[in-house]
A protein has these predicted regions:
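A broad detector of short, well-ordered amphipathic alpha-helices
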Residues: 52-53, 86-90, 114, 127, ...
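Glycine-rich nucleophile elbow surrounding the catalytic serine of serine-hydrolase chemistry
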Residues: 110-118
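Helix-rich "cap/lid" substructures immediately adjacent to catalytic or cofactor-binding pockets
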Residues: 21-108
């Protein structure tokens, strides 16, 4: 738990941060990407350093894709997964700089966002997370290209109606929310 309050790169923060807090850090999953994301944050040297470090690790300019696009590249899983992680890490870095006194009781994320939560909690390094998410995204992209498929949301209808729609189109209802 203590690692969450002073994770790298935040070792410069005060060590006497109260453990009791009701503030959680929640991180977004895939689908949160948009061209231009992070461009304003990159004006901060610490946030810019995260984008530059990711560029070096990945061997391509992820920062340029985030800041300038094209949208087609940013929506590919092998690009958007590390991109969303780096953007979320930059947001958290900026928040910690603006409000260093803020104590978090926990970190959580939706799917891909779990990796940002692990980083924020000090469980994985930035470098490890970028490498893992590049591989995760690449494997998922390859799987999508090998077996073209898709998903659709059916909202505000009874489960029976959703099942009828799915059956009529050769699909299966897979998730219920």
């Amino acid at each position: 738990m203590e690692a969450f309050f002073t994770p790298e790169p935040f070792s410069r923060l005060p060590t006497e941060i109260p453990i009791m807090s009701n503030i959680a850090a929640i991180f977004a999953g895939q689908g949160a990407q948009a061209v231009g994301m992070g461009k304003d944050l990159a004006a901060d040297p610490d946030c810019a350093a995260l984008f530059a470090k990711a560029d070096d690790i990945l061997g391509f300019k992820l920062s340029e894709i985030c800041f300038e696009g094209p949208a087609e590249a940013l929506t590919k899983t092998n690009i958007c997964q590390p991109a969303i992680f780096v953007m979320s890490a930059a947001c958290f870095t900026a928040l910690r700089k603006l409000r260093p006194q803020t104590a978090f009781c926990c970190a959580a994320g939706l799917s891909l966002g779990e990796w940002t939560a692990l980083w924020a909690a000090g469980a994985v390094s930035f470098e490890e997370a970028v490498r893992i998410l590049e591989a995760r995204g690449r494997f998922m992209q390859e799987a999508c290209e090998a077996a073209p498929s898709g998903m659709v949301s059916i909202l505000r209808v009874p489960v029976e109606t959703a099942a009828e729609i799915a059956a009529a189109t050769g699909c299966t209802v897979a998730n219920y929310n």
